[in-house]
A protein has these predicted regions:
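Glycosyltransferase donor-sugar binding loop
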Residues: 41-43, 257-285
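Membrane-proximal helix-turn-helix segments that form the acceptor-binding/catalytic region
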Residues: 85, 136-180, 188
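Conserved donor-binding/catalytic core segment of Leloir-type glycosyltransferases
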Residues: 181, 217-236, 241-247, 258-261
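Nucleotide-activated donor-binding/catalytic signature segment of Leloir-type glycosyltransferases, i.e.
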Residues: 273-303
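Short alpha-helical donor nucleotide-sugar binding micro-motif in glycosyltransferases
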Residues: 302, 310-315
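Aromatic "clamp/platform" in nucleotide-sugar-dependent glycosyltransferases that forms part
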Residues: 323
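Short hydrophobic beta-strand element within catalytic cores of glycosyltransferases
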Residues: 340-344
C-alpha cells in the first residue's frame, strides 16, 4: 500500500491543527493510502479517541527521539527536515503538512515527483511581517503573543525566532505544493493577498465524537448559563468577558452562570487560569474550578467530553470572544449541538460559520456582546 506522510509540528495536545491533521490521516486511509504520522517530537496519539473520537493507534509514526515542551516554536523549524526524512524512509507518494516552515522541504519533494499538500491555518508571513500591522493580522497585535513574548527574556526568545524564520520560509506555497488548502473563505482572501493566488477552502471537520443534534433541548429546559469552549489562553479573551461582559449580565440577572471549558496542560495555560481566578476575586465575582459548580463562573479544566456535551446541551447561549478567529471549531461544535451563538464580527467564524450574521448574533464591544447574550438568554 502506498505511503502518505502527514506532517505536524506537535501531535500531543488537543487543538484545531491536531483535528485537521488526524482527520487528514483518516481521509488518506479511506483513499487507499497507508498514513505515516510525522513530527520533530515523539508522537502520542493515545488520547485522540477521548479528544475527537478518532483512533490513530494503527498508524506508523516518525519523529526525532525527543520529548520537549520547551522551545516549541524553534522545534517548528525542523518540521521540514522530518518530512523529508519520513518521505525518504517510507518511500511516500504524498506528503501533507500544515506548517509553513516545511515549505522548502515540500518544494524539494515536489521536484522529486512526490505530491505535496499544504494546509494553511493562517499565512505566516502576514502574522510576522509588520507591513500587516494596520490590518490586525500581525502577531505583535495578538494578545497571546504580547502576553507570552512581550517581556524579557521571552521577547528575546521571540526575536531570535523571527530572525531565523526567513531561512525556512520565503517560498510561495503555490510553488511548493501541488495543492494548497485553507480553513475558511476569510483566511483564503488573506492567502490570496499575501501570495497572489487563492487556495481551495476546506473547512475543518466536526470531530466524530461531537454528535449533531437534530432536535436540541427546548429553551424552557435550559439553565441560565453561557458556555465558552477553548484552551485556556489569552487569545480566547476569557479575561475580557469576565471584565467587560459578565458584570452587565449579572446586573441584569444574578442567576446567570458562565462556564469556561478548555484544556490546561501547560505552565502558560495554568498561569492564565490563575489570572482568571484572581481577576474574578478582585471583582467580587464567585468562581470555582469544581465540576459541581454553583458559582457565577465555572472553570472546567480538561473536562471529559461527556461533561462538555452535558453542559453545552443545558446552556442557553454559546459565546466566542476570539478576534479574527481563522475558523472556530468550538463555534462549529456549538452549532452542531443547537446552541444559539454570539460571535465577534471578525474572521472565518463570522464569515463562514455565522455567514455574516445569518446563523449567529455578532458584536464588536462589550456592551454589544452583553446585549446579544441577554437577547438569547431571554429568548427575544
Amino acid at each position: 500500500m502506498a505511503k502518505a506522510v502527514v506532517l505536524h509540528h506537535y501531535w500531543n495536545e488537543p487543538g484545531g491543527g491536531e483535528l485537521v491533521c488526524s482527520s487528514t490521516a483518516i481521509a488518506l486511509k479511506a483513499m487507499g493510502f497507508d498514513p505515516v504520522l510525522a513530527s520533530p517530537m515523539k508522537i502520542d496519539v493515545s488520547k485522540y479517541p477521548q479528544w475527537y473520537g478518532i483512533s490513530l493507534e494503527d498508524f506508523e509514526t516518525y519523529s526525532y527521539p525527543i520529548d520537549l515542551k520547551a522551545f516549541g516554536i524553534y522545534l517548528r523549524l525542523f518540521v521540514g527536515n522530518v518530512g523529508k526524512r519520513a518521505a525518504e524512509k517510507f518511500n511516500a507518494e504524498i506528503v501533507f503538512s500544515d506548517e509553513a516552515t516545511s515549505r522548502r522541504a515540500l518544494k524539494e519533494l515536489r521536484e522529486r515527483g512526490i505530491e505535496t499538500i499544504e494546509y494553511i491555518h493562517f499565512p505566516l508571513e502576514a502574522a510576522v511581517n509588520e507591513d500587516y500591522r494596520k490590518k490586525g493580522y500581525f502577531y505583535g497585535n495578538d494578545p497571546y503573543i504580547l502576553e507570552r513574548y512581550g517581556r524579557f527574556p521571552m521577547n528575546l526568545y521571540w526575536w531570535v525566532y523571527k530572525k531565523i524564520l526567513p531561512q525556512f520560509t520565503g517560498i510561495n506555497p503555490f510553488d511548493a505544493s501541488n495543492l494548497v488548502l485553507t480553513n475558511s473563505s476569510w483566511t483564503g482572501n488573506i492567502v490570496r493577498e499575501v501570495y497572489g493566488e487563492k487556495p481551495t477552502v476546506l473547512n475543518p471537520p466536526i470531530p466524530p465524537s461531537m454528535e449533531i443534534v437534530e432536535r436540541p433541548r427546548d429553551f424552557e429546559e435550559r439553565e441560565k448559563s453561557v458556555v465558552m469552549i477553548g484552551r485556556y489562553s489569552e487569545e480566547k479573551r476569557y479575561h475580557w468577558v469576565i471584565e467587560e461582559v459578565l458584570p452587565r449580565l449579572l446586573r441584569e440577572d444574578p442567576e446567570i452562570r458562565l462556564y469556561i471549558i478548555g484544556s490546561s496542560s501547560t505552565p502558560h495555560s495554568r498561569a492564565y487560569v490563575s489570572r482568571l481566578m484572581k481577576l474574578a476575586g478582585s471583582m467580587g465575582i464567585k468562581i470555582s474550578e469544581k465540576e459541581e459548580c454553583s458559582e457565577s463562573i465555572c472553570l472546567l479544566l480538561n473536562a471529559p467530553s461527556e461533561l462538555k456535551l452535558k453542559i453545552m446541551d443545558r446552556s442557553r447561549v454559546f459565546m466566542h470572544a476570539t478576534v479574527n478567529e481563522h475558523w472556530g471549531i468550538a463555534v462549529a461544535e456549538a452549532m452542531a449541538r443547537g446552541i444559539p451563538a454570539v460571535i465577534h464580527r471578525s474572521g472565518g467564524a463570522w464569515s463562514d460559520l455565522a455567514e455574516d450574521g445569518r446563523n449567529a448574533l455578532g458584536y464588536v464591544d462589550g456592551d454589544e456582546a452583553a446585549d446579544a447574550v441577554l437577547r438569547l438568554m431571554n429568548n427575544e
